[in-house]
Swiss-Prot record:
Keywords, ordered alphabetically: Leucine-rich repeat, Repeat
Family: Belongs to the ANP32 family.
Protein name: Acidic leucine-rich nuclear phosphoprotein 32-related protein
Keyword Cell wall biogenesis/degradation recorded: no
Family matches, as Pfam families: LRR_9
Matching Gene3D superfamilies: Ribonuclease Inhibitor (3.80.10.10)
Entry annotated with the keyword Acetylation: no
Biased composition (Acidic residues): 197-244
Region (Disordered): 197-281
Native species: Plasmodium falciparum (isolate 3D7)
Length: 281
């Protein structure tokens, strides 16, 4: 665990290097407010690790989940600590709970589920923690009793939530779950608006004027007008031809009629002359 603590300090220093000037260990110890050592295998806290932990001046959250720790001895007293997480370890005695009361008197959240506590009455010790409002104890042997929450609420009056349920039996999300849910809601809303705006953009794109399309439409319109003009001209030509033919035919008929009339007049004159001649004789 000593290496994990030093690595965390070095990481903080690199993240807070300003203008090429490295942050100091003192800055890191004063500024770090949480130390998460989940999964780092250990059974107890060594003296070297204890001395390192003493350097943290403003630690508010300490997580030792799934480390296999069996005792809390050598973890220094941390008055600023608000959250202590010790789930899935090998803790089992009332002495562990007493140590928590003595050394972390201001904690508001204690997660100690998945350990080996068998006697629910041992937890009455925690009533000395006046700020404790959230307690996690599920997957301990005593929690097999379906009424364990009710019993804990009775001798821990300040506690508001046990294993995500309040005194009325209503489920209450943890702060981490609330943040995750808010993040999902924000993303859902964001995705909704992005999709909505995208649809609107797609609709707008459908109605964006296209100069080429306008030109094509104008060309097509011009072609149609030209075709109509040609059809009109062709029709006029045909009408003129029909008129000329009719005119010629009419003129031909009139000419024939005049020729026939002249012939008839000549014949009539001949007949008149013959008649006059006969009378003279």
């Amino acid at each position: 665990m000593e290496k994990a603590i030093r690595d965390r300090v070095e990481k903080w220093k690199k993240e807070h290097t300003i203008d090429g000037k490295d942050a100091t260990n003192e800055h890191a110890y004063e500024s770090l407010n949480e130390l998460i050592l989940d999964g780092k295998k250990l059974t107890s806290i060594k003296n070297e690790e204890k001395e390192l932990l003493k350097n943290f001046k403003n630690l508010e959250r300490l997580c030792l989940n799934q480390t296999g720790i069996q005792t809390l001895e050598n973890i220094p007293s941390i008055a600023t600590l608000n959250v202590l997480e010790l789930t899935d370890n090998h803790l089992s005695s009332v002495e562990v709970l007493k140590y928590i009361v003595q050394n972390f008197p201001n904690i508001k959240t204690l997660e100690i589920g998945g350990n080996h506590f068998k006697n629910i009455n041992d937890f009455e010790t925690l009533k000395e923690l006046k700020n404790l409002v959230r307690l996690g104890v599920q997957f301990n042997p005593f929690a097999d009793n379906p009424n364990y929450r009710k019993e804990l609420f009775e001798f821990l009056p300040n506690v508001k939530i046990i294993d995500c349920y309040n005194k009325e039996g209503m489920e209450v999300l943890s702060s981490d779950e609330e943040e995750e849910e808010e993040y999902e809601e924000d993303n859902t809303l964001k995705n909704f608006y992005e999709a909505d705006f995208k649809d609107e953009d797609d609709e707008d794109e459908e109605f964006v004027p296209n100069d080429n399309e306008d030109d094509d439409e104008d060309d097509e319109l011009d072609d149609d007008l030209e075709d109509e003009d040609m059809e009109d001209l062709d029709k006029e030509d045909l009408d003129k031809e029909d008129y000329d033919i009719d005119t010629k035919e009419t003129e031909g008929v009139n000419k024939d009629e005049k020729s026939n009339k002249r012939k008839q007049d000549a014949l009539d004159n001949t007949n008149d002359m013959d008649l006059k001649k006969t009378k003279l004789e």
